[in-house]
Amino acid sequence: MNARIDIGNEAFSAAELATAESRASATPMMEQYIEIKANNPGSLLFYRMGDFYELFFEDALEASRALGITLTKRGQHMGQDIPMCGVPVHAADDYLQKLISLGFRVAVCEQIEDPAQAKKRGAKSVVKRDVIRLVTPGTITEEKLLSPSESNYLMALARIRGGAEPQLALAWIDISTGVFRLAETESSRLLADILRIDPRELILPDTIFHDAELKPVFDVLGRTAVPQPSVLFDSASAEGRIARYFGVSTLDGFGSFSRAELAAAAAAVAYVEKTQIAERPPLGKPERESAASTLFIDPATRANLELARTLSGDRNGSLLKAIDRTVTGGGARLLAERLMSPLTDPARINARLDSIGFLIEEPSLCGKLRDTLKHVPDMPRALSRLALDRGGPRDLWAIRQGLQAAGGLADLLASAMLPEELDQALSGLQALPAGLETLLAETLADELPLLKRDGGFLRDGASAELDEVRALRDQSRRVIAGLQLQYAEETGIRSLKIKHNNILGYFIEVTAGNAAPMTETSEAKSRFIHRQTMASAMRFTTTELADLESRIANAADRALTIELEAFDRMTAAVVAQAESIKSGARALAVIDVAAGLALLAEEQAYCRPQVDGSKMFAIEGGRHPVVEQALRRQAGGPFVANNCDLSPKTGDKDGAIWLLTGPNMGGKSTFLRQNALIAIMAQMGSFVPATSAHIGIVDRLFSRVGASDDLARGRSTFMVEMVETAAILNQASDRSLVILDEIGRGTATFDGLSIAWAAVEHLHEANRCRGLFATHFHELTVLSEKLGRLSNATMRVKEWDGDVIFLHEVGPGAADRSYGIQVARLAGLPASVVARARDVLTRLEDADRKNPASQLIDDLPLFQVAVRREDAARGPSKVEEALRAMSLDDMTPREAMDALYDLKKKLK
């Protein structure tokens, strides 16, 4: 019996277990465990023993801590107690869910023979076991382990060296839906691309994992990044591996891919094969994404804007939660995908907007579509489980219900003059196999069990043989009732019962005090065969009861066999139509997203944005989509709408920059964020919270609004702010939108002012982007006199009887103060502190009037950044070219000295 113990925190590691000494001293069962564990490094081993999955040694320590389950011991190994813990097989999914959410990987090891078979090989033979599946965060398909509204991507990162710069590429697969995509990337945008796709698991060569340049990326990803042997990413064999998976001789029909993309795709496929053992999920053909096709949003911006989750990790309070009106799992995932990857192609964006506009104009049709969509199950995930032999009767029902709903939606749309996107969706629905829905409807019962092994999922009439077997089973129940009555009358024991359990099968049970008529005579003893005596009862059987039990057991076995054969036939019919089912499911998701965004637009009074290839950014009556809804829920009054116009001024080709000043609590940060969110919503193809909006395509969006310490990496708030600002100034183009809030506030006043001043100049002269720059450095407002595309804007306030009222309105002009002392008083600072602060402020303001910033600007030369950029654009110097051409490893010392003199001459 296992005892509760304090085993401590030490146990044999996997490497120590695998030694020859360890194996030699192990029991036969433990030797088997050690061998299987050695073949599955990096995974917790769920080792099946009867009705439990047991974990031993280091795995037991980790699992007991992670799951909060009791740590016990099972014997000793090499003189040390063997730590052990376990989970019941019937509840394994619940424990797997927790382990996977914590980033663990689990190897599921099952008994692949009956213990009776093992005994035939010898009394001490160990039951054969093998790993049937590796469960990892990126390769799960079980409904209980997946979030219906989130994709579950496995991603692979590959690098090919050669040429001036190494090639990097990403491939990502969701085996629960069959999505398979790939794209090239660069080290400078690698983290941004990974976070945009948001994989649950990233595999990469161990050589890249230990690359110092990319280490900061993997530090952010934590346990999501999993190093693998570099051979998995071999580009030479990549094309062949992918072709074999899809059963084709060449990838010519799939499109053109770079070597790095093929290496990443092949590694992802190989990892899927490795984790699924003998099964193959039905993946779609790999689709290539161009980096230029989506709006680039850097990691800091994505976090600051709280697109899918808040900074605390909650979905509530995010933009996605605020705009999600979808009613299907596929629709929710597609909406999230569009939000995280807004487009840069006006034609594709406007096609999405056309769908929303059409459904707004057809409210009755939109309502009927949504009513039908509410009954659509998650067909892609049901299909994947069926293809991987993990499906059940309810997955077949999901396919049947989805096909039925698709037919209803097609009927609703067929007579309408549809815009392009909805017309393509209709074609996808009409291409679904009509006969498959009929087959499933005529075969599946109305009430379905969870597991196919439970039987009872075929309706009466689906199989004549099954009907016959079921009749025998039902008839047997009546026969048993008759036998019970007969035996009671024959013995005179009115309390006699016929019962059943898994050990004895069917048996007759009477109380010990009433058993005499069944035991006193030899005739009675020969008729009622004694099976078991208990404290208060005795159990018997008869020849006819044993015969009946045999017939019932055979009938039940035969019934289940018939049902399982029918299940396999239905599954094969479904999997044969996998491509059309996935296309139809995608069409359902497109309709769901369009209908949901149409409802959102009507409900929240959003407008259709004008999106084109210009550099316009003109928002009238813009609102923050999340804050506005929160105010409405809390009855906090209407949201104050504001205009924002960063469009090129007359005669200028580049967009404008607004320098925004105003008090704390005046609404600056909300105004900054809402304009960034409006740009994202417009380019994802959604109506936006404004009365009108004209947005020229934004290629890159940067938002530095708020910052915090990064203690884990030894970076202060100011350092984090500077790193994020550097990324913006180095990467923003003339098509970018930049949102900056209070740059320079984390250091000394003059240092901060100087940095903010230089940053504004750089944005205006070098980046030439559209931007909003909020600041408390009022000295910066004088820059509008010299920078033609810079305009001052301020958050308006009203002073009344010594108090300040925040109007949350944006207007032209500059604030002359920040009202920080008034805010401090509202926050409850002691009156003496507030009074002293007023006195200090008065003295500082008097000193500032003697040296105003307007004098400073006349003394400072502007546009130096632009001059330096022009110098850089002239190309490398002769010295740089000569250095690049040198092969230093092949030079003699004399040749190196000559080369150095030659370089010195070139400098002259």
From Swiss-Prot:
<dbReference type="InterPro" id="IPR017261">
    <property type="entry name" value="DNA_mismatch_repair_MutS/MSH"/>
</dbReference>
<dbReference type="Pfam" id="PF01624">
    <property type="entry name" value="MutS_I"/>
</dbReference>
<keyword id="KW-0227">DNA damage</keyword>
<dbReference type="InterPro" id="IPR016151">
    <property type="entry name" value="DNA_mismatch_repair_MutS_N"/>
</dbReference>
<dbReference type="InterPro" id="IPR007860">
    <property type="entry name" value="DNA_mmatch_repair_MutS_con_dom"/>
</dbReference>
<dbReference type="GO" id="GO:0003684">
    <property type="term" value="F:damaged DNA binding"/>
</dbReference>
<dbReference type="GO" id="GO:0005524">
    <property type="term" value="F:ATP binding"/>
</dbReference>
<dbReference type="InterPro" id="IPR007695">
    <property type="entry name" value="DNA_mismatch_repair_MutS-lik_N"/>
</dbReference>
<keyword id="KW-0238">DNA-binding</keyword>
<dbReference type="InterPro" id="IPR027417">
    <property type="entry name" value="P-loop_NTPase"/>
</dbReference>
<comment type="function">
    <text>This protein is involved in the repair of mismatches in DNA. It is possible that it carries out the mismatch recognition step. This protein has a weak ATPase activity.</text>
</comment>
<dbReference type="InterPro" id="IPR000432">
    <property type="entry name" value="DNA_mismatch_repair_MutS_C"/>
</dbReference>
<dbReference type="Pfam" id="PF05190">
    <property type="entry name" value="MutS_IV"/>
</dbReference>
<dbReference type="Pfam" id="PF05192">
    <property type="entry name" value="MutS_III"/>
</dbReference>
<keyword id="KW-0547">Nucleotide-binding</keyword>
<keyword id="KW-0067">ATP-binding</keyword>
<dbReference type="InterPro" id="IPR007696">
    <property type="entry name" value="DNA_mismatch_repair_MutS_core"/>
</dbReference>
<dbReference type="InterPro" id="IPR005748">
    <property type="entry name" value="DNA_mismatch_repair_MutS"/>
</dbReference>
<comment type="similarity">
    <text>Belongs to the DNA mismatch repair MutS family.</text>
</comment>
<protein>
    <recommendedName>
        <fullName>DNA mismatch repair protein MutS</fullName>
    </recommendedName>
</protein>
<dbReference type="GO" id="GO:0140664">
    <property type="term" value="F:ATP-dependent DNA damage sensor activity"/>
</dbReference>
<dbReference type="InterPro" id="IPR007861">
    <property type="entry name" value="DNA_mismatch_repair_MutS_clamp"/>
</dbReference>
<dbReference type="Pfam" id="PF05188">
    <property type="entry name" value="MutS_II"/>
</dbReference>
<dbReference type="GO" id="GO:0005829">
    <property type="term" value="C:cytosol"/>
</dbReference>
<dbReference type="InterPro" id="IPR036187">
    <property type="entry name" value="DNA_mismatch_repair_MutS_sf"/>
</dbReference>
<dbReference type="Pfam" id="PF00488">
    <property type="entry name" value="MutS_V"/>
</dbReference>
<keyword id="KW-0234">DNA repair</keyword>
<feature type="binding site">
    <location>
        <begin position="662"/>
        <end position="669"/>
    </location>
    <ligand>
        <name>ATP</name>
    </ligand>
</feature>
<dbReference type="GO" id="GO:0030983">
    <property type="term" value="F:mismatched DNA binding"/>
</dbReference>
<dbReference type="GO" id="GO:0006298">
    <property type="term" value="P:mismatch repair"/>
</dbReference>
<dbReference type="InterPro" id="IPR045076">
    <property type="entry name" value="MutS"/>
</dbReference>
<dbReference type="InterPro" id="IPR036678">
    <property type="entry name" value="MutS_con_dom_sf"/>
</dbReference>
